[in-house]
Structures are given as C-alpha cells and as structure tokens.
Design a protein with these regions (language model features):
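Conserved helicase C-terminal RecA-like lobe
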Residues: 165, 361-373, 385-518
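Helicase P-loop NTPase motor core
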Residues: 25, 29-37, 41, 274-277, ...
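Conserved RecA-like helicase ATPase core segment
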Residues: 2-7, 43, 229-324, 394
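Short, polar/flexible loop-turn hinges at active-site or ligand-entry regions and domain interfaces
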Residues: 49-54, 74-80, 95-108, 118-130, ...
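P-loop NTPase Walker
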Residues: 1-102, 106, 186, 210, ...
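Conserved helicase NTPase motor core
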Residues: 6-17, 21-29, 36, 56-57, ...
Length: 518
C-alpha cells in the first residue's frame, strides 16, 4: 500500500512526518504549504496520533477553508473541523453565550458603516463616506490589538499612527467610544467582537474553556504571518497549557499589517513554545528561475525572511522593468502588450494586471475596454453576490420543476436567454459587457460539466453551482484579471503586469518605518 506521504518532496515530507508537539513551517511562495499541512493532518489521523474529531484547522478565508477541507476529503480524511478564526469563534459563542448570559447572542453586523456614521455624527466628526471608511478601519485596528478607546489613544501616539484627512487620534478615540456605546444599545456586535467576546469568555468562564479544550486537542493554523494580537490570544486560550499546534506561514508574505496583523508571532514562535521544531519549504513550484531570482534579490534585504526560494520550474522569460512617462502611457502600452499576448495564443484568463490600490484599476478598465479586451475585476463584488448571477440562479432553480428532453446545456442556455444572455457579447457598454460575462461564465460551467459527465442534468448543475457558492470558488471568466496585489495573493497566471511600481505608491507612502516597508 502506498504511503500517504509519497507524493511529497523531501522538505514537505519532513514537516508532515512531525505530527506531535509545536511545529513551525516557514513556507515560501509556491512551495506547497497547503499540500504539506493537509498531508500532515492526514498522516497524523491515519497513524492514530490525532483523532479527527478533536482536530481543528484554522484558515483566514472561507475559500481557503473550503480548499483545505476538499483536499482532506481527497486524502480520505473526514471529521476534521476546518474553519476561519471567526467562524470557529462564532460557533463557540452561539453554543456557550446563551448558557452563561441567559440571553440571545448580540446581532452580528455585516458592516460597521452605519454605526460608525452615527457615532461620528454624535461626536461632530466629519461623516462623509471616506472619513467613515477611515474611522472604521482605525476602530478595527484598535480592536484587533485589544485596545480600549483610552488605550488606543496611548498606543496610537506611541506608534505614530498615520491618519487620513482631518482625523486626529483624539477624534478617533471619541468616535470609537461612541461606537461601542451604539453597539451596546443595539445589542449588536461586529466581526472583531466575535473574537474579543470569545476570548473574554474563555478567560472568565472556566467551564467554557475546559469544554473547548476537551473538544479540540490538535491545532493547525495556516497563514500564521497574518495573525493579529486578538487571534493569537484566542489560539493561546484554545490551547491552554498544551502545545500540540502546527503553524505555517512566511514573514515575507505579511499583507495585512495595516489592519493589525503582525508576523512577529511566526518569527518569535519558539519564544512562546520552547519545544518548537522548525521546518523550511523552499522549493518553489509556482515560478520560473528568473522570477524566483528577482524575488530572492528583493527579499535578501529582509532579515525576517528565513526562506530563500529555489525554482523547480526551470528557465523562463526574464522579468522586464519598463518606465513610462505617465499613467496614461503605462496603461496604453500595457494594453498593447496584452493584445500581443492574446494574439500569440495566451488566453485572457491567464493574464493579470496588478496594482497597489483599487483606484488604479480605472485607467486599465478604460484602456482594455477600448481595445475590446474582456476584463474581470477581482476584489470587487463576489461573483455569486452579483445581481445578474443571483437572478440567473433563481431562474435555473425555477427550471428544475420543468420536465423536458433537451440536453442540460441547451436547457441552461434557454433559461439564461430569458434573463439577457446571448451567444454573442454586446458590442458596447461596460455594464452590459460585465453582465454578459457573468452569464456566459455560467454557460461555460454548464459546458464543462456536460463534457465531464454526459448524463448530467439541470439538478446536477444547480447543485455544482451551490457548492461553488458555498466554498466561494468563483468561476474564472475568460477575461484579463485586474486586481490589487492583496487580492491576488496565492493566485497564478501565465503573464503578469505589476503597474505603478513607483516610490510612494509601492510600498504605499504612509509606510514610515522599516517594519511597515517590509
């Protein structure tokens, strides 16, 4: 019988074989960290070291959780809980809160905006859209750092928080306090409160802490370089006096420091867990040698990054650096290069333009649309949250009650035709084109399913779409991706243009210390 670890390389296998005690895996980009931790969990379960029902794997996004859960299923592992920090904490709150407080759990707000706006108005602080957004971000930073309004004031001065517009530390502190009062009055909580409340209850109610620790004995945490103080505190409380935890991450890939995340917990992991065994994954299966060489050159100046990547892809095109006179010229010439790549046979979906902030997308949207190049904005509205997609799914479900002899793909085309789909893309109009792209993507998915399973019927297709929606696996339209660097993390394309590599923009200008620049 083949060993479950035979599919791993030597570095991955060494980490996966270490199934007991604290483990820290430093995994560079494209080195197979998800593959390693899923095989480690599977190996621990198969060998009887871990009970799957007492194992909790924590990720940072619902999509990552879905991918990890799916891979464990492919390895024959079931029963392991795979959740985000927030979903794991919320599940515990829903169970324990009514027991200890004899009341319902506060309502979870999908957005802070309205409550922050109310608090800003009460404090006579500017409440325009941009100011509310900046206030909400600053309140979030304070809460993930476990700071009260008074403590925020002191900490913000200490670390020299860079505030936008007319905001001051004093104004933020006052709005923060008023915001907390509004939450309390409305019996509501935000996403940070989910973690803060779980942490507080674990600290103050031993019965809850003991029950959670009895339930979960083995922990795995992905993307540990992006853990915030409140998340690390919650993990520590889940563990108690135990240390059966495996963390994986890369200090060089910390991308959420602006919202309170810090790589210090990964870098200093051994100071918290003295028996920690360290492993490095440096074999990059994602990028060719020229790209890895440039990455290593950039990261060589970062003393916190222990991993020097080694490409397993061999040679490839060199990385090119091009200067432009202005943003308009940059967009125009990148657009021309994209046309040339498409003419050479590279599909639009295999091309991406990345930038630091979302506002940079507009000029590329205009240029590529003018050239007739289909585009897909990533990091904007989620695919399954788009109005036209929701409407399409509603009509597809309605079609489940209609019997007929047509092939599934024909039925899908007929139904989507009733909501605006046509075989040919519209000639003009960005909104019309985006709607058509969404509907045509659903048609493409139907064709893919029919090709895989000629017996597939409409109920099978609707079920597959529901599964994608649940796991946030949005389908990829055949369009050039426009995305911020943050939204692009972990994704791959054949050709990538990084726009706006200019002093003050990358890294963003409000980075003032060495840590912020890193």
């Amino acid at each position: 019988m083949p060993d479950i670890l035979d599919a791993l390389d030597d570095q991955q296998r060494a980490a996966a074989e270490c199934v007991s005690g604290p483990v820290a895996i430093f995994a560079g980009a494209g080195t197979g960290k998800t593959r390693t931790i899923t095989h480690r969990i599977a190996h621990a379960v198969e060998s009887g070291v871990h009970d799957p029902s007492q194992t909790l794997a924590v990720t940072f996004t619902t999509r990552a959780a879905g991918e990890l859960r799916n891979r464990l299923g492919q390895l024959g592992v079931s029963g392991v809980q795979v959740r985000t920090f927030h979903s794991a904490a919320l599940r515990q709150l829903r169970f324990f809160y009514p027991q200890f407080f004899n009341s319902s759990l506060p309502d979870l707000m999908p957005s802070k905006f309205r409550f922050v706006a109310d608090a800003a108005t009460l404090c006579r602080v500017a409440n325009d859209k941009d100011s509310i957004r900046d206030l909400a971000a600053e309140i979030e930073w304070a809460k993930v750092n476990i700071l009260s309004p008074d403590a925020y004031r002191e900490k913000a001065v200490q670390v020299r928080r860079d505030l936008s517009g007319d905001l001051t530390i004093e104004k933020v502190s006052k709005v923060f306090e008023a915001y907390l009062t509004r939450l309390d009055e409305a019996h509501a909580m935000d996403f940070e409160d989910v973690l803060l409340l779980t942490t507080a209850m674990m600290e103050n109610y031993p019965e809850m802490a003991n029950a959670v620790r009895k339930q979960y004995r083995h922990f795995t945490v992905d993307e540990f370089q992006d853990v915030s103080p409140v998340q690390f505190e919650l993990l520590s409380l889940w563990l108690g006096d135990r240390d059966d935890v495996c963390v994986v991450g890369d200090p060089a890939q910390t991308i959420y420091s602006f919202s309170g995340a810090t790589s210090k917990y990964l870098i200093d992991f051994k100071s918290h867990f003295a028996r920690t065994q360290d492993f490095q994954l440096s074999h990059s299966y994602r990028s060719t040698e020229p790209i890895v060489a440039v990455a290593n050159q950039v990261l060589a100046k970062d003393a916190t990054s222990p991993v020097r990547l080694v490409s397993q892809r061999g040679k490839g095109p060199n990385v090119s650096l091009t200067s432009y006179a202005n943003d308009e010229e940059e967009a125009r010439l990148i657009g021309q290069q994209i046309l040339e790549l498409i003419a050479k046979g590279i599909a639009p979906r295999d091309i991406a333009v990345l930038y630091r902030i979302n506002s940079q997308s507009e000029i590329f949207e205009a240029e590529l649309s003018a050239l007739g190049v289909p585009i897909s904005l990533r990091g904007a509205e989620r695919f399954f949250e788009r109005a036209e997609v929701k409407n399409a799914l509603l009509n597809l479900r309605a079609g489940l009650h209609v019997t007929g002899t047509k092939a599934m793909t024909e039925t899908v085309r007929d139904i989507l035709s009733s909501v605006g789909w046509r075989a040919q893309a519209p000639d003009s109009g960005r909104a019309a084109r985006e709607t058509w792209e969404s509907l045509n993507t659903i048609v493409d998915l139907a064709d893919e399913l029919q090709a895989k399973d000629s017996t597939a019927q409409l109920p099978d297709f609707v079920k597959s779409l529901d599964l994608r929606s649940e796991m946030e696996f949005a389908p990829s339209a055949n369009a050039v991706t426009l995305a911020s660097i943050h939204a692009a993390k972990g994704l791959e394309w054949e050709a990538v243009f990084i726009a706006g590599v200019s002093e003050g923009l990358l890294p963003i200008s409000h980075a003032t210390t060495a840590t912020e620049f890193n």
